[in-house]
Amino acid sequence: MGSNNGRAMKLALVPLPKGSVLLPGVTLRIPVSNRPDLANLLSALLDQTNLGKRDGNTITFGCVPLRSPLLSNDGQQLIDDGSVDGAKKEEFDAIDAGQARKEDLFRYGTVGKVIGVQRRAYAEPFLVVQGVQRFTIKHILRERPFFEGEVVLHNERDAISSDAETVELFQQLRQLSRELITLLRLSSLLPSTGTRLSPLVARKFEVYIAKTDLSQAGNLADFMADVADPTFEEKLRVLASFALRTRLERVVELLARQVQGIKNSVKVTTISTSSFPSNSPFDISQIDPRDRELLARRVMAGLTGLTPPGAAGGRNNEDEKETNEVDELQKRLQEAELSPEARKVADKELRRLRKMNPANAEYGVCRTYLENIADIPWTKVTEDKLGPETLKRARNQLDEDHYGLETIKKRLLEYLAVLRLKQSTNQDVERQIAALTKELDAANEVLAEKDVPALSESDRVSLEAKLNLLQSRRLADKSPILLLVGPPGTGKTSLARSVATSLGRKFHRISLGGVRDEAEIRGHRRTYVAAMPGLIVNGLKKVGVANPVFLLDEIDKVGGANFQGDPSAAMLEVLDPEQNSTFVDHYINIPIDLSKVLFIATANSLDTIPAPLLDRMETITLSGYTTVEKRHIAKRHLIPKQIRANGLAEGQVVLSDEVVDKVITSYTRESGVRNLERELGSICRHKAVQYADAVDNGRLDTYNPVVALGDLEDILGIERFDEEIAEKHGRPGVVTGLVAYSTGGQGSILFIEVADMPGNGRVQLTGKLGDVLKESVEVALTWVKAHSFELGLTHDPNEDIMKNRSLHVHCPAGAIPKDGPSAGLAHTIGLISLFTGKAVPPQIAMTGEVSLRGRVMPVGGIKEKLIGAHRAGVKTVLLPEQNRKDVKDVPQEVHDGLQIVYVRHIWEAIRQVWPGAHWPGQHHINFVESRL
């Protein structure tokens, strides 16, 4: 391997990326990303420069390639390519330059000088290094934070020999180098769109080769070895060749193989080595036109180091590769079972592809188009798990994954039942069709053999009519288009996954939030550069079947009409069960059947969904979870999930129902359970710290897995939300109303306070009230003023109760916005309580809208309001009669703990609040009841 009588020195070492070798006189780009060793090395070199220990204009270090399992540590070839043991190969492939060990490094390397840093837009930076001098590693001094070793440098001039054999090898090197450059100059025959070697660059190569003498033979060998693009092992052997003769032999062998490979690829057998002198042009007109085109392509391949088949490190014949690609594409199209329209288009494009020059830009466009057609699942479907246990299995799956949500579960089970019945009906029809077809085939065989009809003409016509009738009775599977509407965190997305699991179908999620270009839905037309199919077709390609479950997430956040089109309008065809069997993507431009796809869309609000799009979907509303439902979800799903996520085992964190309820009501106020899961995660992490400390200190018996109510403030901080509790004593002008929070899923009681004072009839409203709530106060006051005589508030029907009096109506928690008409009944009762001096029992709460006629009208959020009332300690609740149906959704424990009274008129509510009181207008109560 040459003399080792070089100078020993300490040198920082940088492992090169896999497959890279730096030779003297050659430049190499080293990626900087994910290389902590390189960053530490550059930082240390910069510190030395600042301290004056190093010239800041020259930064050098050793560039060491990774070892190869095919070579010994001295660069000797051990075994042939391809026969290496699989375990060794996998071990070698897994080596990362940034995490390399000293055992992974090659014995030889090159001193590299940093000549610059390159970084293109939106790309990782590269360190540009130029090879200076070979060295041998004696031993590694350290591995971290960067490699450093003691190396022996080798002087190139010491290896120069002027014997006749070396001179002959040098002449062969120059001749083969000129010949290769001449062949590479033929790249100018290629179209302008292809990769080509500039004649100016080729001319500079020729000048450099011509000026090189024997003293620079080693540099020329290193340079041409890099140009010839050998295999990784061949580069390592060149690097390990310190002796000039050995190096020349190996490089001459590489160049000869490269030149001969280019010649053989175009079948030019009459051209000898002497035919390519640098001063005589190559006569391309003497070659057959077909071979001329192939030569141009082969020369382009020569830029990357083409070698003939069978040679070490060689590549397959490019023409055969292109032919194999087209044949493989044709095979894929045949296996795809295309529709008749798709088959017609694919055959036409395939014929065009075979006639096209691969160097043509349209070749890649056409091939990509055919590959997309082949990837679409035209007929391949997933067999649904539809059997006697289908509904039971699906019900168990949905109940296991989600608590509550009975409405959506019911609708999905209905779909499964219909699908099961359709399949049974189709199976019966198929059996009848098979029997009739068999009978007709038998009759045709008799007619063909004996020339005598086995059936009369009338019987044959009758059988064919029955066959056509049966074929028309086949039930098509048109999947519904479901729209799940509800607040965030209520399980809409996970519910769609459960549907796919229960059906046994593949699942794909398409996020529509922020989509503003119609082409993202329906694809780009092929005339555009880099055109591709839309989200729908790409989803089908990804799942590989024609009947998946598609989740169209956040469909309410699709962008509206703009200069790029209207994405929501593009969804009309996708989500129309009558049209999506012939959906046309702009890129594919062939009808695609989407009728077997089960589309489930999700939205937080219906306000931003266009009416035509909304009309095509079946809307199912998911209300927020109640406190009771959240407790069940936390105990069944969230707490076990967080215990596992934080490295704890079952039983190492115990939360009682009271603790969970406290977290729900005092630390979260949301419709879903996302924030609840975060808070439970904080509790589990707190207990994980305690458990880890107990284990580390050997005092595991002191660890208490139980989380008490008093621990919550230390873990989660002070309570973020205060819960209203029913008063123990009533006072005039104060009434308990019911409220459902706008976040959904939670309700509570709301105290309404009314006070009067001397004034001019003015009414002041405070508590951050909305316009609707203010109007309900005005309606309540108008009704009380109109019936003040019947209520015993005045002695004369014409007397104004507000004369010389002003009112102030206040709703506590003034920082929280409040709106809605549901407090009308509570406002009316509060005004009557203030004017009569009768206190409202604190255990009574009420909700309902009031009209000027005194009718109590229905309101929303009954379920949440009743749960909040039960939690606050209310015993009796007054509800509008028309809300009786809504009470069916209330949990049984809440229903049993409340006395629910339904009222239709204010007079009925008055009698329920003050049952023993006598009113001057008592006869009006009886009159109203008789009218109702």
Swiss-Prot record:
Recorded superkingdom: Eukaryota
Cell compartment(s), UniProt: Peroxisome matrix
Chain span(s) of sequence motif Microbody targeting signal: 930-932
Major site of localization recorded for this protein: other
First-tier enzyme category under EC: hydrolase
Catalytic activity, EC: 3.4.21.53
Keywords: ATP-binding, Hydrolase, Nucleotide-binding, Peroxisome, Protease, Serine protease
Cellular compartments per GO CC: peroxisomal matrix
Residue ranges annotated for the Lon proteolytic domain, each copy included: 729-916
Ligand binding (ATP): G486, P487, P488, G489, T490, G491, K492, T493
Known role: ATP-dependent serine protease that mediates the selective degradation of misfolded and unassembled polypeptides in the peroxisomal matrix. Necessary for type 2 peroxisome targeting signal (PTS2)-containing protein processing and facilitates peroxisome matrix protein import.
Protein name stated in the entry: Lon protease homolog 2, peroxisomal
Organism phylogeny: Eukaryota, Fungi, Dikarya, Ascomycota, Pezizomycotina
